[in-house]
């Protein structure tokens, strides 16, 4: 009788000591270069496509991340962001998930928490955003003013930006603060 009670107790202690599986990494990237000469720039900006350089950079992103265990590809709903995500989605066989929370600072914390929960046990998720939303996401993920320069973030809280189209941010979700975030350069394919 004593053995029957001890074995389940022992098993539960062992299992509780094993850490729960968690999502390992978030990759963040600004959409690739968009066409400059868009006729309806203001009213139809959300539909502005990628330039040839942007298409090359999107293909470079796919080549760079296709072996990284991408479990999901999230994007804002603009044409340029979706087109940036498309080559990686095709390479990994993952659909693109358009989510407005990628562009709404007030929804970002909940969005990031839901990704951690939904993809617990997976290796990585990509988020494609914009020059003004990538910094907001990075702040929600632990970026502090002391690492803004290293991460390519400019401006003041409330109006942070990233410059250029070549940034690829890798956030190690097992770490915290600035040490969790690395910025790499993403060159377009020739």
Positions of PLM-derived features:
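Bacterial N-terminal signal peptides
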Residues: 6-17
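Positively charged n-region of N-terminal signal peptides that target proteins for export
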Residues: 1-5
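Sec/Tat signal peptide C-region and signal peptidase I cleavage site
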Residues: 18-22
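Active-site-proximal alpha-helix that buttresses catalytic centers in soluble enzyme cores
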Residues: 23-119, 134-190
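Residue-level preference for the first positions of well-ordered beta-strands
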Residues: 26, 122-128
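Long, charged/polar, surface-exposed segments that mediate recognition or autoinhibition
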Residues: 131
